[in-house]
């Protein structure tokens, strides 16, 4: 990429603001910085179900599970969704930099993420309002067979705020279909209700919180740091959780809870 090529693509993207062509010009601009195999722009609104605004791909298999699985509830375990919930996130985030320490061991990673053939993913975050975040996620999948290199990641980070600003300006008037809906209850509360209705298992708020930490890929040490309690206390929470659910392993916890996730988004 030369400076003149980048400047030309940036000028094209600026001229395309507030037109339907912006996503394509945005894509061309990003490709000057880092070649990618797929791009998807997603709008997150609070804890409601997210909306896909744009997608492009080399191999369609990468988005085959998107509508049924990701939007059907798997997004609740996505590290990028968790970043959105932090609020006011701008700039570049690499998935593996924000994912929990045991992310690759999770049901989400093994049964959803690997199915997409994604090898690496970087997101441009743009905070539109207090509750709405846009992410432009660019990925490398089996089409290229390799992750982003150091030079590409450096280029993306260098222009991260420019890319965020383009997204924010273009979608500044974006209104989610959920804007008139009441905010859903916290996901821990929804999980407790679904588990009680489906299996007559009554978790305490803390047990539900720990269960979700485990599903997202947090180790016991990571959970202790997030909750501000000792590692031994987390181990006690896990034993209580497993006993109440009549299970003895993390795999059984995934098998019990993952089918409930579609129910958690019914009112999202």
Which residue ranges define each predicted feature?
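Short, low-complexity N-terminal regulatory "tails/caps" that precede and couple sensory modules
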Residues: 1-5
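Recognition helix of helix-turn-helix DNA-binding domains
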Residues: 217-252
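Pre-recognition alpha-helix immediately N-terminal to the DNA-recognition helix
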Residues: 208-209, 252
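Regulatory input/activation interfaces that engage signals or partners
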Residues: 6-17, 24-132, 138-140, 150, ...
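Short helix-to-turn junction characteristic of helix-turn-helix DNA-binding domains
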Residues: 214-218, 257
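Short alpha-helical interdomain "coupling" segment at the junction between an upstream regulatory sensor module
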Residues: 167-185
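Regulatory hinge/linker segments at domain boundaries
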Residues: 181-206
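Basic, Lys/Arg-enriched C-terminal extension of HTH/homeodomain DNA-binding domains
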Residues: 191-200, 239-268
């Amino acid at each position: 990429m030369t400076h003149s090529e980048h400047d030309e693509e940036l000028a094209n993207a600026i001229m395309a603001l507030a037109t339907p062509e912006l996503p394509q010009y945005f894509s061309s601009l990003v490709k000057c910085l880092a070649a990618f195999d797929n791009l998807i722009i997603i709008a997150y609104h609070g804890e409601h179900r997210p909306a896909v605004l744009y997608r492009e791909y080399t191999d369609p298999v990468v988005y085959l599970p998107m509508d049924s699985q990701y939007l059907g509830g798997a997004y609740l375990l996505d590290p990028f969704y968790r970043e959105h919930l932090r609020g006011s996130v701008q700039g570049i985030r690499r998935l593996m930099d924000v994912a929990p320490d045991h992310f690759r061991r999770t049901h989400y990673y093994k049964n959803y993420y690997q199915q997409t053939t994604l090898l690496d993913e970087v997101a441009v975050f743009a905070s539109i309002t207090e509750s709405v975040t846009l992410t432009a996620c660019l990925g490398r999948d089996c089409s290229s067979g390799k992750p982003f290199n150091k030079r590409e990641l450096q280029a993306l980070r260098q222009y991260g705020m420019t890319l965020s600003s383009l997204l924010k300006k273009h979608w500044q008037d974006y209104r989610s279909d959920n804007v008139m809906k009441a905010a859903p209850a916290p996901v821990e509360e929804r999980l407790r209700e679904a588990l009680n209705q489906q299996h007559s298992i009554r978790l305490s708020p803390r047990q539900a919180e720990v269960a979700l930490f485990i599903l997202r890929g947090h180790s016991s040490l990571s959970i202790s740091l997030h909750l501000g309690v000792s590692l031994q206390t987390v181990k006690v929470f896990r034993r209580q959780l497993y006993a109440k659910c009549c299970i003895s392993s993390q795999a059984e916890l995934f098998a019990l809870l993952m089918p409930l996730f579609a129910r958690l988004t019914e009112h999202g």
